[in-house]
Every structure is written in structure tokens, then in C-alpha cells.
Regions:
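Aromatic-Pro/Gly-enriched surface loop or interdomain linker
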Residues: 1-53
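Short, hinge-like loop/turn segments at secondary-structure boundaries
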Residues: 53-56, 101-105
């Protein structure tokens, strides 16, 4: 059993889906036998507190959610072998902390209205995508990012910009990726705006596989 810190603090836009999403994500982790602590307290990110944590999940966080001590603690803990998973607006967090872009892989800039579009699997061998069809019709809030993920990130999913209005990344438009941060592991998905999306078996399996991939990578090798 591992200790997981589920973090949903917001200081900017707050998604109405957070409560249901936290129940679903927490349930997936508890179903695997893990001890989940759900918090919005930034002081949970202290070196001594993180020492017993295996994974932190940033679920639809937004704005500046940590203080300087928490930022230093998170970066050190993750670089030393921790695990970070980000869901949806996690990339809309910590806009004044440059290092966070290296943790999350990219930074959110804007999005159009919720629309249905085609999601394409890029890496079918990853635990978060192995269950998905090659092309998947999904309704969500399609994020644009300041840049494409860094070269050390593996893009897992893209969305077809031709299918909806408001995409500005060009093709391919990444929406999920994974990669290292020092000796630590990261995974991010932009999916998960609407509360009812978390009732979709495909999205649940996508989330479950992503969480498992950073929490227990040896199980998914």
C-alpha cells in the first residue's frame, strides 16, 4: 500500500467537477489498496510530510497553489524519485513558478468551448492508453498549451484540431503525455472538464492506467 496525496486546491477558476472527480480518482486508488489523503492545504507540501508519500495527484488545480517552501519541497521530492500525476487544469497551476512547466511538461494558455472531437492514441503500449480504441470520440474542453511538451516527454494522446473550433497547436495537438523529472515520474492528461466524463469507462480506465504507470511502474512494464 502506498500513500497518495490528492490535491485539488484552486486560487483561480474552480471546476464544478472537482468533487465528483475526486471521488472517482480516490476510489480508483483505494481500490488498488492505496491510502489516499485528499487535501487543499498547501502545507501538505513540506519535505517531512512528503517523505512518506509515493504519489501526488493534482486534480484540476489552478493558480498559485503552493508557497515557496512547498515549491522547493515538491521539486526536490519529485527529482529524488517521487511521482506526480496531473489531470485537466493541473497545467493551469503555478503560473509564476517557471520550474512547474518542467514538472508538468507544458503550460495551459486557453481553450474553446466544450466540443466533441476525435482523440487519437499515439502510444498504445502505455497503461493509460492500452485499453483505448485507436480513434476515440470524446467531449471535453480542448486545451491549448504555450508549447509542445519537452523532448523528454512521450506524447500518449492527441486531438484532431480539424474536428473542432479553437485549436491553436497545429497537428499533432498533444493532450496527454508522460516522462521523467530527475529520478521521478510524471503523467498528465488534459481530459476531465465535465463531471459526467468521470463516469465514462474509457476515461476511468485512462486515468487508472496513468496513475498506476507512475505509482507502480514495475507492474506495467
Amino acid at each position: 500500500m502506498a500513500q497518495v496525496l490528492l490535491f485539488t486546491r484552486t486560487t483561480d477558476y474552480r471546476h464544478a467537477s472537482i468533487a465528483h472527480a475526486a471521488d472517482v480518482v480516490g476510489g480508483l486508488l483505494r481500490g488498488d489498496g492505496h491510502d489516499v489523503r485528499h487535501t487543499e492545504d498547501p502545507t501538505a507540501f513540506r519535505s517531512d510530510a512528503l517523505a512518506s508519500v509515493a504519489l501526488t495527484v493534482w486534480l484540476s488545480t489552478s493558480g498559485d497553489v503552493l508557497d515557496d517552501e512547498g515549491r522547493d519541497a515538491l521539486a526536490s521530492w519529485l527529482a529524488d524519485g517521487g511521482a506526480w500525476a496531473g489531470i485537466h487544469s493541473a497545467t493551469f497551476s503555478e503560473p509564476t513558478w517557471p520550474e512547474f512547466e518542467r514538472i508538468a511538461g507544458a503550460v495551459f494558455t486557453d481553450h474553446p468551448d466544450v466540443q466533441t472531437a476525435t482523440v487519437r492514441v499515439v502510444d498504445a503500449g502505455h497503461p493509460s492508453t492500452a485499453h483505448l480504441p485507436a480513434a476515440w470520440r470524446h467531449t471535453d474542453e480542448w486545451y491549448n498549451f504555450r508549447s509542445h511538451p519537452a523532448a523528454d516527454r512521450t506524447v500518449l494522446l492527441t486531438v484532431d484540431e480539424a474536428d473542432y473550433d479553437g485549436g491553436s497547436m497545429g497537428e499533432p495537438h498533444p493532450i496527454a503525455w508522460a516522462g521523467p523529472y530527475g529520478r521521478g515520474r510524471t503523467w498528465y492528461t488534459a481530459l476531465g472538464h465535465e463531471a459526467d466524463a468521470y463516469d465514462d469507462p474509457l476515461l476511468r480506465a485512462h486515468l487508472h492506467g496513468g496513475l498506476r504507470s507512475v505509482l507502480s511502474p514495475e507492474e506495467d512494464a
